[in-house]
Amino acid sequence: MASSLHKHLLSAARHHLKETKRMSMMVALNLAAEILAVDCGLKPCFLYDYTTSGVQQICSYLKELQNLGLIVGHLHILNVEETILIINVTKAVSYLETLLHSQDLHLIDVSNYLSQPELVSSNQVPQIHAQLAELLGHIKPYQSGQPTSVSVGGIQSPEWNLCTMFGFLLQFPSTYWFDTQKGFENCLSFTPLRLFTVQANCSRIGHQSVQIYSFTVPECVYQATQVHLEDWSKSLKQAFNEQNYFTDLEIITNTAQVCCVY
């Protein structure tokens, strides 16, 4: 049964998605599992970075997964300056609305002029709320999409900090921000980082060790964000218990230091 499904998933990915070389079985299964994590509500969004496929190719692929009976909810494909995100609109809208009513966004300022990362000042919150409201205003109309359907939308050249907006859409517990008016570089080089990786087995398609989340928090602000990280982990575990696509959830923490972060 699993072997037959694996072949169907590989065939669907190779048929619909553009790639310079033939996609392997492992990559095809990882891709399908990441989309299933969005569909079942484990996370609100998936940033598509597997191939150079365009919106219509990805749309065709998602419809093929629906034909296979794997996707049961409505998914939205959002194209932001050629970056493609696959969104569970209901979950994303709920999370963005929560952020709009919060004064503590758990943002980490990594502007290049800082000697080390620090929590974002409260006087930046109104500007970030305005960008969140614009993003919410774009995706909320798609909330009425029918189950087992795919919608498509695009945003051209938004005056947003895309790093921050993508972090919100991906529901990272702590998201990076930097002052775009003073440049797009950051102060993360040689900064000790705590790397969080969330993985689980996708029993729905018989695939092991699927990465669901991966994000970093600078060690210098870890203590200040620890309570929120624990709350985020509890919320994730609750969402995990409410679905039946994935089993054996693991949250893994490591410490790393990189020479340069873009």
Swiss-Prot record:
It comes from the Eukaryota. Pfam families: DUF4504 (PF14953). Belongs to the UPF0739 family. This is UPF0739 protein C1orf74 homolog. The lineage of its organism: Eukaryota, Metazoa, Chordata, Craniata, Vertebrata.
